[in-house]
């Protein structure tokens, strides 16, 4: 049975950036990694309603900078910046003896962001909306926003069925084997009365690097 690897895996360093931008020696690496995990979990849990797509963590000597990509920046910043100050104070308890800087980045097209689409489908499933309807609506919104292709998958006891299964819906193209293809991937879980339902979303936004054919054509034209 063919298994799918994480679409970001082979693309990091080619067309995708790292979510953690720091270097540590063997002695401190594990501590930093655990700290990163705690920070991500806390921010995600604390600001779930704001639609947090991803969190970049940059480290210097005694400084940690968080770039939080969100669909609703106002919900995190709060009135007069109170929300962001509150978040910073709470994070300071997790990260001791380090100065925290928080930078909020707005996600311009949340309907084309794989993580936010997955979370939206999961929220609808928790509200007892039919999974097919939730998936198809998300696909339609994404295609209208101008993406080249989208694929969704829901796994679990769909519709309260006795036997768990996986259902896929897709539209457009999803070239998973093409490393220059900008494929965004998101995963979320819905806690329903029948158990957890996993939601996976792949979004193809177009090629990042120019195709070999185009380069050859330019070289011939210049010759």
Curated annotation (Swiss-Prot):
Cite the PANTHER family for this sequence. 30S/40S RIBOSOMAL PROTEIN S3, SMALL RIBOSOMAL SUBUNIT PROTEIN US3C
For the KH type-2 domain, which residue ranges apply? Answer: 39-108
**Purpose of the protein:** Binds the lower part of the 30S subunit head. Binds mRNA in the 70S ribosome, positioning it for translation.
What is this protein's name?
Answer: Small ribosomal subunit protein uS3
Sequence similarity? Belongs to the universal ribosomal protein uS3 family.
GO MF terms, alphabetically ordered = mRNA binding; rRNA binding; structural constituent of ribosome
Source organism (scientific name)? Clostridium botulinum (strain Okra / Type B1)
SUPFAM superfamilies per UniProt: Prokaryotic type KH domain (KH-domain type II) (SSF54814), Ribosomal protein S3 C-terminal domain (SSF54821)
Record text on subunit structure and interactions: Part of the 30S ribosomal subunit. Forms a tight complex with proteins S10 and S14.
Gene Ontology process terms (BP):
translation
């Amino acid at each position: 049975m063919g298994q799918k690897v994480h679409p970001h895996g082979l693309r990091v360093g080619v067309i995708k950036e790292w979510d953690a931008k720091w270097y540590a020696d063997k002695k401190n690496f594990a501590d930093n990694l655990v700290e990163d995990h705690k920070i991500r979990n806390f921010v995600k849990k604390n600001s779930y309603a704001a639609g947090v797509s991803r969190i970049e963590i940059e480290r210097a000597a005694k400084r940690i900078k968080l770039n939080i990509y969100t669909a609703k920046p106002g919900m995190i910043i709060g009135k007069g910046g109170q929300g962001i100050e509150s978040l910073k104070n709470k994070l300071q308890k997790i990260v001791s003896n380090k100065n925290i800087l928080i930078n909020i980045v707005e996600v311009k097209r949340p309907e084309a962001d794989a993580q936010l689409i997955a979370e939206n489908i999961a929220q609808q499933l928790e509200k007892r909306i039919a999974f097919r309807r939730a998936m198809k609506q998300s696909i339609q919104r994404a295609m209208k926003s101008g993406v080249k292709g989208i694929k969704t998958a829901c796994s679990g006891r769909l519709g309260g069925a006795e036997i768990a299964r996986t259902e896929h819906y897709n539209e457009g193209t999803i070239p998973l084997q093409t490393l220059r293809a900008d494929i965004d991937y998101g995963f979320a879980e819905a806690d329903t009365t029948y158990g957890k339902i996993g939601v996976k979303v792949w979004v193809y936004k177009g090629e990042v690097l120019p195709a070999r054919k185009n380069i050859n054509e330019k070289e011939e034209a210049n010759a």
